[in-house]
């Protein structure tokens, strides 16, 4: 389960930044996890609680935005939603689709007291 390592990395990064800023307890963390990122969001939420235990992030509210996958056909230029990396163009039927978004995995912001 790589969600635990992701949760641990998020906690470490946010706690380190909070300390740099001279802040106290972290009360909220906003993440962006694209639907094509290969992350089980519910597992990540569960793992976050364990990873944050005993840190400045313990008890912080975790808010996760899940942007949809978007692709652009390299044959005809059409843009459309995709649910996998092996997408067929909805306009011309070609399989030459470049994934434009949906793979995001980032801390958008966090709140400290």
Curated annotation (Swiss-Prot):
GO biological process, one term: protein maturation
Domain of life: Bacteria
Keywords: Metal-binding, Nickel, Zinc
Listed GO MF terms: nickel cation binding; zinc ion binding
Pfam families membership: HypA
Gene3D superfamilies in the cross-refs: 3.30.2320.80
Residues noted as binding Zn(2+) in the record, renumbered to the chain: 73, 76, 89, 92
Residues given in the record as Ni(2+) binding sites: 2
Known role: Involved in the maturation of [NiFe] hydrogenases. Required for nickel insertion into the metal center of the hydrogenase.
HAMAP family according to UniProt: HypA_HybF
Protein family membership: Belongs to the HypA/HybF family.
Name of this protein: Hydrogenase maturation factor HypA
Provenance organism: Chlorobaculum tepidum (strain ATCC 49652 / DSM 12025 / NBRC 103806 / TLS)
Gene: hypA
């Amino acid at each position: 389960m790589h969600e635990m390592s992701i949760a641990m990395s998020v906690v470490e990064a946010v706690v380190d930044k909070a300390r740099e800023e001279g802040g106290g307890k972290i009360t909220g963390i906003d993440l962006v996890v694209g639907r094509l990122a290969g992350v089980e969001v519910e597992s990540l939420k569960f793992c976050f609680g364990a990873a944050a235990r005993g840190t400045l992030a313990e008890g912080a509210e975790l808010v996760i935005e899940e942007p949809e996958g978007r692709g652009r056909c390299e044959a005809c230029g059409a843009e459309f939603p995709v649910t996998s990396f092996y997408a067929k163009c909805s306009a011309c039927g070609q399989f030459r689709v470049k994934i434009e978004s949906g793979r995001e995995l980032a801390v958008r912001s966090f709140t400290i007291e």
